[in-house]
Amino acid sequence: MSSSQNLGGATRCGRVIGPSLDKIIKNAAWRKHTFLVSACKSVLDKLEALSDSPDPSSPLFGLTTSDADAVLQPLLLSLDTGYAKVIEPALDCSFKLFSLSLLRGEVCSSSPDSLLYKLIHAICKVCGIGEESIELAVLRVLLAAVRSPRILIRGDCLLHLVRTCYNVYLGGFNGTNQICAKSVLAQIMLIVFTRSEANSMDASLKTVNVNDLLAITDKNVNEGNSVHICQGFINDVITAGEAAPPPDFALVQPPEEGASSTEDEGTGSKIREDGFLLFKNLCKLSMKFSSQENTDDQILVRGKTLSLELLKVIIDNGGPIWLSDERFLNAIKQLLCLSLLKNSALSVMSIFQLQCAIFTTLLRKYRSGMKSEVGIFFPMLVLRVLENVLQPSFVQKMTVLSLLENICHDPNLIIDIFVNFDCDVESPNIFERIVNGLLKTALGPPPGSSTILSPVQDITFRHESVKCLVSIIKAMGTWMDQQLSVGDSLLPKSLENEAPANNHSNSNEEDGTTIDHDFHPDLNPESSDAATLEQRRAYKIERQKGVTLFNRKPSKGIEFLISSKKVGNSPDEVVSFLRNTTGLNATMIGDYLGEREDFPMKVMHAYVDSFDFKEMNFGEAIRFFLRGFRLPGEAQKIDRIMEKFAERFCKCNPNSFSSADTAYVLAYSVIMLNTDAHNIMVKEKMTKADFIRNNRGIDDGKDLPEEYLGALYDQVVINEIKMSSDSSAPESRQSNGLNKLLGLDGILNLVYWTQTEEKAVGANGLLIKDIQEKFRSKSGKSESAYHVVTDVAILRFMVEVSWGPMLAAFSVTLDQSDDRLAAVECLRGFRYAVHVTAVMGMQTQRDAFVTSMAKFTNLHCAGDMKQKNVDAVKAIISIAIEDGNHLQDAWEHILTCLSRIEHLQLLGEGAPSDASYFASTETEEKKALGFPNLKKKGALQNPVMMAVVRGGSYDSSTIGPNMPGLVKQDQINNFIANLNLLDQIGSFQLNNVYAHSQRLKTEAIVAFVKALCKVSMSELQSPTDPRVFSLTKLVEIAHYNMNRIRLVWSRIWSILSDFFVSVGLSENLSVAIFVMDSLRQLSMKFLEREELANYNFQNEFLRPFVIVMQKSSSAEIRELIVRCISQMVLSRVSNVKSGWKSVFKVFTTAAADERKNIVLLAFETMEKIVREYFSYITETEATTFTDCVRCLITFTNSTFTSDVSLNAIAFLRFCALKLADGGLVWNEKGRSSSPSTPVTDDHSPSTQNFMDADENISYWVPLLTGLSKLTSDSRSAIRKSSLEVLFNILKDHGHIFSRTFWIGVFSSVIYPIFNSVWGENDLLSKDEHSSFPSTFSSHPSEVSWDAETSAMAAQYLVDLFVSFFTVIRSQLSSVVSLLAGLIRSPAQGPTVAGVGALLRLADELGDRFSENEWKEIFLAVNEAASLTLSSFMKTLRTMDDIPDEDTLSDQDFSNEDDIDEDSLQTMSYVVARTKSHITVQLQVVQVVTDLYRIHQQSLLASHVTVILEILSSISSHAHQLNSDLILQKKVRRACSILELSEPPMLHFENDTFQNYLDILQAIVTNNPGVSLELNVESQLMTVCMQILKMYLKCTLFQGDELEETRQPKNWILPMGAASKEEAAARSPLVVAVLKALRELKRDSFKRYAPNFFPLLVELVRSEHSSSQVPQVLSTVFHTCMGAMMDE
């Protein structure tokens, strides 16, 4: 025999087998194992002679088939010996052959004669000898065999191999061997199903983790370092196989690309067949139960447990094949789910834990294909335990809580549960029940209830349930962040570090699990939209509401469902609802079907008719009929239902009974029998004979067959007739209406069995069948489709369901528990909840969480503060930093907390309080003291301190303000101790919140500022302890955020400015000053930034100064504002742009201030601005210059000193000089100039172009219009000065104005000046091309001018018009109309001024006027006269109601008492108006007369015509006025009563006729051509005759008068005194008439003599008061009449 070094020869197999055979020879008993020894020697000799000869069909590498059989025979013989020393080398040899892949081929039960089959069978068999070492060796060989890629162990052989390992585990006495057996089985599962997944023998394999296998079971068999030993055992086997050389051929080829992977034939399909078979048998093993006789079979329980553990390994490591391959998916549904279902009734905790672990994996990985199953198992495994609050199993419930926490690690899983179940009409509200169940657990058993839990267990449950709720809300937040596609997770960073990473794909790969695969066979993309899900959920909620109502009041419920269109209004549709809807109360269904109303009756008939009883015996039919509802208790209702049932049964089975009455009676009997047989209260049961006897003669008088009745009796007695959902087990008291509503009563009843012992008895088979039917029924519905959503809007519905329970759980736990870990967990939950609700924009929910957290800080009651309250403060700060962009209105609560923290910290440090801002009466010494350091010296009985120590409610703006009494020392000590807790929060953390504001988004910073303003206002208004903390923070955040884009900053500042205004107007002067000074600092910084043209940011920024200046009642504040504005402007003048508007508004308000020092201070700055910085004003928009002018004008209104007013006007002149001297020309550089028509010939081009720019026009407009308004000032000096400055400006600089601009100047500047005396604005509408804005087109008439002012204005106007007549000639008609308006003014001064100005205008320009221009002048004068006449006549009509002297007695004539006050006022007004009217008319006559006299050579006939019309009209009016005797009497009486002088009516008449006569005579004499053209001579004669008649009227009595006095016609009576006076007054006029007649040419006199001769004769008869009349009359007779007679 060769040496041991060469044993086995040269072949590879020989080198492995040889040493083993040699060892067998040495260990064998020579006598007992002679044949074995000889066989070994023979093989050794043979191996020496063999060489490697590859044979593909050979099971042994390098040998032929025959050689392989011979070589392996000794091994088989050794294994059969049962002798351990021989078996060990044989097993070792087998292990090497398998590990080195020297054995190859397919092993299956179909070829039991194959060498490999025999070898494996022999190996399995040796386990029976009971040697522990042999067991380990067998396990090693079997694992190596399965591990070998060259051997495919199939079918029963594979099962036998697994069973062998299974038996080692179950029957072993060594803990290490048991662990190894389990580990080997788990490794085999990994190998088999990894290859099935890959469909190849060459798949990469993972090594099982032994420690994970012991997580649930077998912890008790873990002896010493057994786990380490077993892990090494598995690793050795796996690595030994990896050391094998590369195979020379592949046993199983993977399917070619494009080929089907589900072929029925081929090696690839065999791998999957084996995997499926193994999975199926494991499921069967897990469903083995003890017999009723032997319920304590612990071996069976362990085997079941092991099977479930192996199934867990398979499921945990399963891949996409389980969803993509229908066969594997169905295996899970039909086998694994059935196993879970059957084992669900067991109370063995390890089994329950394994079920939960398997279910968790199914949820994670396969939920998309198992929607219906998940909907059943979740309530069965999880919810029923979770909702059991009073009598839970501690381990069981902890398992469920662990499961829930585990599934929350996958955010998609939580979302999918809600979408596919809570939003599914036919599915239970799993998510809602999870949250509510966790809430119940977190709150613990209700008060007063009994529970089996120990206090420690109860606390554990509470904390774990809170952790689960935190995990849920965290998962929701994680999913939300993922869907929003945010680069960095939106989850708070500090929270991300507290929990494992959310990258589940990576973490799950490490622990051997993966998330649900992308393959979703039932995925419905159309339903993934959140809006659709919202509709479905709303429909479900509404329908559940109807079901709940039905279970209370069936008829109301049906009406509601029909009205809400959840159920159709036909009986058939209602029947479908009753039969197919889960959650309906069976008793209520029966009650409804038995109702006597019409519609329920129709429903009952339709319900019964929906059943098909064909070929059913009566017992089956009634049992089938009653499975859907419970018969009502009322006999009449049962009668109606049974009557219809009998009819339906007979209709389906017409040959069963002779009539329906038989079926009706028999049905009643069966119901009574069922009650009698199965009611425990009935002691004496009905016998079969009794039943038969009771039913005799019911078939139309005949008896039914006894056999028939007997069989029916047996059916009912043996098998109770009951509803399909009824269970033989009683319902738990914990069962609630929600379970019924979701149709889970029947499912949950089976798991409510309470077993005190671990009995391996399975669930009720009937119930299992019912559940399987539910699976099948749901799988065919559209609702079974699995939905995946990506729209984060779905979170809104989830939050609506969960936020209440979460808030309650977190709040109650945080409030009741002082455990630090519990508090931290609750605060994490709050933070996640705030994150989700804030990002989703759910304001109510967000504010609820934030408010609760703020309350839990306990800052409002610091005396009771604990560590958990400080943690809440930290959480509040973290929320502010991390979710600040989404807090919106919730910022108020957070900032309130920060304010209170700072307050408490200041109190603790003894720093001075803010009282110094508010208590102005305190001495400086007291202000400096502040509060003592509380931590060192205790506290004083200070009101503020006592209020803080006492505390208050969270919502109160102040803390304990109205609680009287001193605080006790122990209260103070406790308060100081609690203040030490706040040392954990540094000022940096507080300030960081405010500094972080610059990182907030636009909407967030706006909300932040709003909230801070609100908090600050609350601080300032505190009645006990006002503070400025938030006010200072407002200034800080303004600094922080000032560099934001202008659009955002303007929104921020609009809020801040309103706040600063409200605080600046505060009654507290110190606070107002503080705010204004802070505002000044902000403004100074803001003005450092340059502003581009046409922006308004600076103006908006400075607006608070303006408003406070305008509204503040404090002189100190107003003075401070003026100083602030002055400092800002003078130091930042180059950067001020739009801010000028606010600057001038402030100074404008200051100019009208009641304090002289404020006025002078503001004017001093204005003076400096105008003198030194005028160019900065004009470089901005035109409105800025307008504001400057308005400001200066306001200063002119100052009543403190005339120097300010006059200086302001001088500055207006200065502004004009600056404008005219080119103060704006530099702005036009670079502007392309266009040629324009020069105003005059001597202007430079730059000056010509200067006024063509709209910008430059806009600068002059406010200046000129401002001065124009000043002309109506009540002070004469201001009026005169403004008039002078205005017209000087126009006269000095008018040459640079364009023609268009001049039109605007007249319409908007000059004409409004005269409104106060003219009262008409008609001129302003005549110039449509005005460049002036409409705001300057009207001028307020505030004061009436005196004569001097009127004269000045008119003089200035004429001078200006004369100077620029060439340019403004078009305004002549308006100017003349204006002067005519002055003339007709009621006041004498303007009238005289108008006359003088008009005459001067005509004198200066008369020779330059055209015909039309002259005509315009006279027409204007004519219009003035006519307007005056018409208005005066209206005035005279007011005297009509005053009685004349004819109606009064002599005593009453002058009796003032008989005239009322109104009449006296009317008389006084008429007298005054008459006097002014006469004056105006005389002035008009004078103007016309003077114009003709001076310019008669320039006037044409058309002009003369207008002149004559004017004089004729006025003279006629004067005559009419003087001839109204009644009016004269009334006026005379009024003057007598009022002691006034009478109006000069006679003088008015005489003067007008005198002028009229003079003009006519002058025309006839000096302008015969015009006289002839206009027949002036005829008009002259007419006037002369009229004058003579007027004279004769007062000197002679006319005929009508004689008749009245009844005197003879020829009587001559002497004149009275009045007539003499009138005659004397008219004498000069008569003389003038006689002279005019005398001067007529002879022909003319002769022509008119017949007309006036009688009048001359009458003059002779008249009594004259003047001798001059007779003398001139005699001359007329002598000269004219005599000459005419001589002819």
From Swiss-Prot:
Protein name as annotated: Brefeldin A-inhibited guanine nucleotide-exchange protein 1
BP GO terms, sorted: protein transport; regulation of ARF protein signal transduction
InterPro entries on file: ARM-like, ARM-type_fold, DCB_dom, Mon2/Sec7/BIG1-like_HDS, Mon2/Sec7/BIG1-like_HUS, Sec7/BIG1-like_C, Sec7_C_sf, Sec7_dom
Protein purpose: Activates the ARF proteins by exchanging bound GDP for free GTP. Plays a role in vesicular protein sorting.
This protein's UniProt keywords: Cytoplasm, Guanine-nucleotide releasing factor, Membrane, Protein transport, Transport
Quaternary structure, from the entry: Homodimer.
Annotated Gene Ontology cellular component terms: chloroplast; cytosol; membrane
Species assigned in the record: Arabidopsis thaliana
Regulation of its function: Inhibited by brefeldin A.
Biased composition (Polar residues): 1232-1248
Membrane topology according to the record: Peripheral membrane protein
Biased composition (Basic and acidic residues): 514-523
Main location: cytoplasm
Keyword Nucleotide-binding: no
Residues annotated as the enzyme's active site: 634
Alphabetized GO MF terms: guanyl-nucleotide exchange factor activity
Pfam families hit by this protein: BIG2_C, DCB, Sec7, Sec7-like_HDS, Sec7-like_HUS
Localisation per UniProt entry: Cytoplasm, Cytosol; Membrane
Record keyword Membrane present: yes
Domain SEC7: from-to ranges: 532-719
Residue span of region Disordered: 494-529, 1229-1248
